[in-house]
């Protein structure tokens, strides 16, 4: 019943913000059309706004979980129009804080200790509050030297898992409905989007996992002058409570404060770009939620001329496969050299495009995207925008991208935005190119090859004795003509599934029609038995069942 009420509320919000066009061609649109006369419409001021703005306002009204849904959806620029994605990036994950005493109880349950024992002090007034968790200031008990260390404690909201499970279940139902009925479902891939959102939210609900992310990132950047990562206090961390060293800094978008502190913004902007490319191509572990609120600048006066970033919030991290890492770096270098042929070849070699695509057509498409950028000033060129437009154009040729690559696009866009805000004349290409060239040199260096070989040596030694037997067996099969090839085609499986669904619909429709005929025959025969009005009860039952079957067949179109 709760799910029905929740779905009803979502429908009312969709109608009020005039978003029913988003569901065009689906059964949901037909039901909404019936409800439209009974739902008050939005004001003329809201109606005049763009579809992206209306969607953003609707998500904000539906609550924090849908705000998070919108934020994640904004990263899927391969699935939604650019104007909608841009508007969804404005969603703010700020909600009313929950009671500080409730936070104390959650921390005590998570750590298995009273707060008064675990901490010397715990401020019940939160420093910040979001849809998943909120953050409290605290101090640890005195150490051996009598020092009370300042920390922050991130605490999950009470019953947040139950709320998310209910909303995700509803989103899964809506996604299944859209996939079955929407004419562009193969392009939107709604179930894939909801599954990605579910995975992202599940990761953010495990604060111990977030602590592990922070710990790994800190290890990569230990002692760096470019990036600082707060230390995780593992003795005070659990699944529902995360304790980190407290850090002080200036948000990277607060230009007035940065200037007042005498920070060298030009040096800082270049460092931001280098840090990102190093995370992606050296460490293969990048901060994937790098907006200005999560990227601070160290406020230490001694670091004015050699500024350092501080990373916060480690719930969403990204990693690429070795192949994607290499092909992405090669793609960037091909862009630098205006080698459109190589860009087209790399898209196919990486497996992002089907092997039967015409390289010359893809080359022409890449040229049409990149050439307009090369005629702009260097300070206006965006690698993120080039990459996004390349992938969008490539969708015409059945582009297949892993979610991590899409996450990287969004992160690169954020990093470039932060860099350009700090230094509007930042030449991102000049900063990124040396990093990429070094990465590619190292990839082919003899030292790296030997290192990779030494890692695989135990595996090679394990399988080496079996190789002669396997080769002999394969050659014997070739000579005797016994070699068989097993073909597994996702397209054939999808076709089989579509045919099964069609068969089910046809059978349901035939059954429904038959029951209606039975109802009419019974009515004409006037059989003995019970009547409801002038119609036999069995006619009512048969007619009702037939109508229900036809309705089900219609909804499954």
From Swiss-Prot:
Keyword flag rRNA-binding: no
Biological processes, Gene Ontology terms: regulation of ubiquinone biosynthetic process; ubiquinone biosynthetic process
InterPro entries linked: ABC1_dom, Kinase-like_dom_sf, UbiB, UbiB_bact, UbiB_kinase
Subcellular location: Cell inner membrane
GO cellular component, one term: plasma membrane
Recorded metabolic or biological pathway in which this protein acts: Cofactor biosynthesis; ubiquinone biosynthesis [regulation]
TM helices/strands, residue ranges: 506-526, 535-555
Example of a GO MF term: protein kinase activity
Domain Protein kinase residues, every copy: 121-509
Family as reported in the entry's similarity comment: Belongs to the ABC1 family. UbiB subfamily.
PANTHER family recorded: CHAPERONE-ACTIVITY OF BC1 COMPLEX CABC1 -RELATED, PROTEIN ACTIVITY OF BC1 COMPLEX KINASE 7, CHLOROPLASTIC
Protein name: Probable protein kinase UbiB
């Amino acid at each position: 019943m709760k799910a029905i009420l929740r779905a009803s509320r979502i429908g009312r919000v969709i109608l009020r913000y005039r978003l029913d066009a988003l569901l065009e061609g689906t059964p949901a649109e037909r039901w909404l059309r019936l409800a439209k006369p009974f739902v008050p419409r939005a004001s003329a001021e809201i109606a005049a706004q763009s579809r992206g703005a209306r969607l953003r306002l609707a998500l904000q009204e539906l609550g924090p979980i849908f705000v998070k849904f919108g934020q994640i959806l904004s990263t899927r620029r391969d699935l939604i129009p650019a104007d909608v994605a841009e508007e969804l990036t404005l969603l703010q994950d700020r909600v009313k804080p929950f009671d500080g005493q409730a936070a104390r109880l959650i921390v005590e349950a998570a750590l298995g200790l009273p707060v008064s024992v675990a901490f010397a002090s715990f401020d019940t007034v939160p420093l910040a509050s979001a849809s998943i968790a909120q953050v409290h200031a605290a101090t640890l008990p005195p150490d051996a030297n009598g020092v009370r260390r300042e920390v922050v404690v991130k605490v999950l909201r009470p019953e947040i898992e139950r709320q998310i499970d209910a909303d995700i279940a509803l989103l899964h139902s809506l996604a299944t409905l859209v996939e079955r009925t929407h004419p562009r479902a193969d392009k939107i891939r709604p179930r894939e989007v909801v599954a990605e959102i579910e995975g992202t939210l599940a990761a953010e609900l495990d604060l111990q996992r977030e602590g592990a992310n922070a710990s790994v990132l800190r290890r990569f950047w230990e002692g760096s002058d470019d990036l600082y990562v707060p230390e995780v206090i593992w003795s005070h961390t659990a699944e529902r409570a995360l304790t980190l060293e407290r850090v002080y800094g200036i948000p990277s978008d607060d230009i007035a404060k940065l200037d007042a502190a005498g920070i060298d913004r030009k040096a800082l902007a270049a460092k931001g770009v280098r840090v990102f490319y190093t995370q992606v191509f050296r460490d293969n572990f990048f901060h994937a939620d790098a907006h200005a609120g999560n990227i601070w600048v160290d406020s230490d006066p001694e670091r004015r001329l050699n500024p350092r970033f501080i990373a916060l919030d480690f719930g969403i991290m990204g990693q690429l496969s070795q192949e994607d890492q290499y092909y992405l770096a090669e793609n960037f270098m091909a862009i630098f050299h205006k080698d459109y042929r190589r860009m087209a070849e790399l898209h196919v070699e990486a497996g992002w495009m089907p092997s039967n695509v015409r390289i010359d057509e893809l080359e022409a498409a890449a040229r049409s995207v990149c050439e307009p950028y090369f005629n702009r000033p260097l300070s206006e060129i965006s690698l993120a925008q080039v990459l996004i437009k390349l992938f969008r154009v490539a969708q015409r040729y059945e582009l297949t991208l892993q979610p991590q690559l899409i996450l990287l696009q969004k992160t690169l866009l954020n990093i470039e935005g932060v860099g350009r805000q700090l230094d509007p004349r930042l030449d991102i290409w000049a900063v990124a190119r040396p990093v990429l060239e070094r990465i590619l040199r190292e990839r082919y260096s003899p030292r790296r090859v030997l290192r990779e070989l030494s890692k695989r040596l135990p595996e090679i030694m394990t399988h080496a004795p079996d190789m002669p037997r396997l080769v002999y067996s394969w050659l014997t099969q070739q000579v005797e003509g016994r070699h068989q090839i097993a073909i597994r085609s996702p397209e054939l499986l999808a076709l089989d599934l579509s045919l099964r669904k069609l068969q089910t619909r046809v059978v349901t429709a035939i059954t429904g029609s038959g029951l209606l005929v039975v109802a009419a025959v019974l009515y004409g025969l006037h059989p003995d038995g019970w009547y409801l009005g002038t119609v036999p009860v069995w006619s009512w039952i048969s007619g009702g069942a037939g109508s229900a079957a036809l309705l089900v067949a219609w909804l499954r179109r």
